[in-house]
């Protein structure tokens, strides 16, 4: 249940944080960065998943047992659950700038990742890959200098 069940609370915390904690005058900029960070991480994950696939079978398939959580019919690298939950955690951290909610999201994200491994739907490499690839989107949260008219 942990492997799948905590995704919804993480998403709800993310929605709350981004809707209620981001100042109105910053919403457009924050939402644009969150969108770009998520898209960047997702596209990077799909490209890396096509280029590098450490195993063609998931752990439960190798062991010949039933999966302990939901999964897509693909080899599993990187973990979409890890990618999605970490992307939300980063959005709460950088977008809403609420370290308490981000810490709660991070703890739940780690539980989701451990749960995915315990449920035998991912290897540790799959979930670590998802976590790290989600961090690729951080580039959109870094301060960006607007070009001066003299630079154009």
Set out the residue ranges of the language-model regions.
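Hydrophobic alpha-helical bundle signature of multipass membrane enzymes
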Residues: 1-74, 87-94, 99-107, 112
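Membrane-embedded catalytic cores of phosphoryl/pyrophosphoryl-handling enzymes
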Residues: 70-152
């Amino acid at each position: 249940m942990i492997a799948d069940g905590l995704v919804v609370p993480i998403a709800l915390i993310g929605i709350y944080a981004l809707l209620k904690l981001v100042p109105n005058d910053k919403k457009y900029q924050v939402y644009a960065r969150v969108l770009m960070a998520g898209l960047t991480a997702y596209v990077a994950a799909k490209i890396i998943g096509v280029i590098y696939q450490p195993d063609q079978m998931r752990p439960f398939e190798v062991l010949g047992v039933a999966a302990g959580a939901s999964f897509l019919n693909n080899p599993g690298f990187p973990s979409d659950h890890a990618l999605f939950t970490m992307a939300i955690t980063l959005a709460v951290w950088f977008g809403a700038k609420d370290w308490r909610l981000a810490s709660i999201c991070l703890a739940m994200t780690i539980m989701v990742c451990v749960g995915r491994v315990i449920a035998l739907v991912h290897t540790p490499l799959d979930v670590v890959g998802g976590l790290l690839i989600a961090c690729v989107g951080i580039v959109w949260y870094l301060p960006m200098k607007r070009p001066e008219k003299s630079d154009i």
